Amino acid sequence: MALTCRFRIPVPSYRGRSRRRRGMAGSGRRRALRRRIKGGFLPALIPIIAAAIGAIPGVASVALQAARKQ
């Protein structure tokens, strides 16, 4: 049986999670857009390429099963 102890230590700079969600209102939207454009075209493609590489085995197995059934 495991025993877990938890302690609450007050941290002065931490204010907890904010209750309200403002979304991307005002200057935040512009800042996010500028950051996205600043990275360039290639960094935007990297997650898409990684997802495609990860999906190759699944696509190949479906194609093999379809070929075996015919």
Swiss-Prot record:
Q: Name one GO molecular function term.
A: DNA binding
Site, Cleavage: residue positions: 26-27, 40-41
Major place of localization? virion
- Residues folding into a coiled coil are none
Q: Does the keyword Ribonucleoprotein apply?
A: no
Q: Which Pfam families match?
A: Adeno_PX (PF05829)
Q: Which UniProt keywords apply?
A: DNA-binding, Late protein, Virion
Q: Spell out the residue numbers of the propeptide.
A: 1-26, 41-70
Location comes to: Virion
**InterPro entries this protein is in?**
Adenovirus_late_L2_mu_core
Name one cellular component (GO) term.
viral nucleocapsid
* Cysteine-cysteine disulfides: none
**Cytoplasm found in the keyword field:** no
Describe its function: The role of the precursor might be to condense the viral prochromatin for encapsidation by virtue of the two basic domains.
- According to its UniProt record, which protein family does this protein belong to? Belongs to the adenoviridae pX family.
Name of the protein in question: Late L2 mu core protein
Where does this protein come from, organism-wise? Human adenovirus F serotype 40 (HAdV-40)
